[in-house]
């Protein structure tokens, strides 16, 4: 099962980034006091997770695994601003408590009284992949259902800082939350079956990456020509001139597209 809160992102000309369209949280998070104490990203993530669970009994959830690249930015910014404004004295601890990255998974567990495995991954670009790998291992160990999701928010301050550092070249910044319910057995309306997952980081040549991809596919009984869709993190060419790292990354994607997956439909997502 899968739910997301950014089906129709707000692309208002007043904002330089995509902003998630949020649901009416009163319909999902009934406790008004709890809802008021939640920051925007916490409400977004908790609502998405609760919707994904649907009518599934909390006792059947074997774990809640969440992932985020940057965490609760609004609360983090609020706490740091208070720190500066009050010269490190008389600080309200609430923004700090709410800014911890495991808040969303913890709130879902508290609302439904789920006394099970609860983990949060903050590995920047590898956060969701790490959470998904953990969920798959929990399923292999015997868990029947694992709730796994990822969420990130974008703020004006964060956007300006990332833009000045050159981190948004060729990227259309955005935000959102997504949750998936992984099950050992297919339910009535399964979206897909996960056959395999592999991650590798560090500096690798195109040949090394190609070899690992080929071996990964072969372990799952597939060849490159069997892949119908190829999704990469390729950036816009016109936006990365002068950025050596991004040019190298794009050249690797292009090599894979032109040599390994010539028969695949290709698209990029960033």
Q: Where does each model-flagged region fall?
A:
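Conserved "HGTGT" condensation-loop signature of ketosynthase/thiolase-family condensing enzymes
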Residues: 1-117, 122-129, 137-143, 151-270
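Short aromatic-hydrophobic micro-motifs that form the base-stacking/packing surface
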Residues: 147
């Amino acid at each position: 099962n899968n739910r997301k809160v950014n089906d129709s992102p707000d692309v208002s000309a007043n904002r330089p980034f995509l902003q998630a369209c949020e649901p009416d949280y009163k319909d999902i998070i009934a406790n008004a006091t709890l809802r008021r104490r939640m920051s925007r990203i916490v409400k977004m993530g908790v609502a998405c997770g609760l919707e994904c669970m649907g009518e599934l009994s909390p006792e059947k959830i074997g774990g809640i695994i969440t992932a985020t690249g940057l965490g609760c930015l609004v609360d983090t910014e609020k706490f740091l601003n208070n720190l500066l404004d009050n010269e490190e004295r008389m600080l309200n601890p609430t923004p700090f408590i709410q800014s911890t990255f495991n808040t969303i998974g913890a709130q879902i567990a508290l609302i439904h009284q789920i006394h099970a495995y609860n983990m949060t991954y903050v590995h920047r670009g590898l956060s969701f992949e790490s959470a998904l790998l953990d969920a798959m291992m929990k399923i292999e160990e015997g868990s029947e259902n694992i709730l796994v999701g990822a969420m990130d928010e974008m703020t004006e301050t964060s956007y300006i800082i990332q833009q000045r550092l050159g981190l948004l070249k060729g990227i259309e910044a955005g935000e959102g939350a997504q949750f998936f319910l992984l099950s050992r057995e297919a339910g009535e309306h399964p979206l897909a079956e996960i056959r395999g997952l592999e991650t590798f980081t560090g500096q690798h040549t195109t040949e090394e990456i190609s070899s690992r991809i080929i071996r990964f596919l072969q372990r799952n009984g597939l060849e490159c020509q069997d892949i119908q869709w190829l999704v990469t993190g390729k950036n816009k060419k016109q936006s990365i001139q002068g950025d050596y790292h991004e040019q190298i990354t794009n050249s690797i994607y292009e090599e894979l597209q032109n040599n390994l997956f010539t028969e695949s439909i290709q698209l990029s997502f960033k």
